[in-house]
């Protein structure tokens, strides 16, 4: 399956406050939400996998209910990132990827979000990246890292990601400053909102500015994953649809 060069979606799709005509029609049953979402977007970031690992049958259902060219980004288990803190992870990683395997070619990327106040540990990051690049079910996948402590914003961390062709997740609206740093052949962008984390709307002007950045990344030959995580009040859906429209009108996608 050839993946699109620019994929725009939201962090999650199953939000009750998106119902009642915010995005989902009040007449649309919840069991059909994913199908409707996939009619409007090419990708979704699955956050549920961070909190609990769904059954293989659930991943298989997501695969069957979405179009051929649809792409999933799966958020890595917090057991691995927040409890194990990247150490001694061979078994939990194997378990995680075994469960996600029914997504097959639709598994576009895996996001590893590290916890706040977790300081940079070079050895842990290197060993974890080696595992990801050698385990049978993960070595061919795209991996992105969202650092939530500024100590990871360093040249040594970026060098390690570049060595393994893993992406530094560019996160806007988080508690950390936005850094535009490409470390792989793909871009992973998370838009959390501006002034209020998860609860700010991006203006059309701001979205046009993001579109220009995305166009630049695309022109350099990179695949770009964009996920809006400002889900409060339906801002994520609104902003994702607007950004997609802006880029389509400019023939960027």
Where are each of the predicted segments found?
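Residues lining hydrophobic/aromatic ligand-binding pockets adjacent to catalytic sites
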Residues: 1-253
């Amino acid at each position: 399956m050839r993946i699109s060069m620019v994929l725009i979606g939201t962090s999650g799709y199953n939000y009750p406050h998106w119902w009642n005509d915010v995005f989902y029609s009040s007449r649309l049953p919840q069991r059909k939400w994913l199908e409707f979402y996939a009619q409007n977007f090419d990708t979704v970031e699955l956050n549920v996998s961070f909190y609990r690992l769904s059954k293989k049958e659930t991943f298989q259902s997501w695969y069957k209910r979405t179009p051929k060219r649809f792409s999933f980004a799966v958020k890595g288990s917090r057991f691995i990132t927040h409890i194990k803190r990247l150490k001694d992870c061979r078994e939990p990683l194997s378990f995680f990827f075994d469960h996600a395997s029914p997504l097959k070619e639709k598994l576009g990327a895996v996001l590893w979000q590290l916890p706040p106040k977790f300081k940079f540990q070079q050895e842990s990051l290197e060993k974890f990246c080696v595992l990801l690049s050698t385990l049978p079910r993960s070595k061919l996948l795209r991996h992105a890292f969202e650092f939530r402590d500024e100590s990871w914003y360093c040249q040594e961390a970026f060098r390690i990601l570049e060595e393994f062709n893993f992406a530094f997740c560019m996160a806007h609206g988080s508690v950390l400053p936005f850094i535009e740093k490409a470390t792989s052949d793909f871009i992973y962008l998370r838009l959390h909102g501006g002034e209020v984390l998860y609860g700010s709307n991006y203006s059309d002007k701001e979205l046009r500015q993001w579109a220009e950045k995305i166009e630049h990344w695309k022109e350099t030959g990179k695949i770009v994953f964009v996920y809006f995580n400002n889900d409060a009040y339906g801002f994520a859906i609104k902003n994702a649809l607007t950004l997609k429209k802006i880029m389509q009108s400019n023939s960027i996608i």
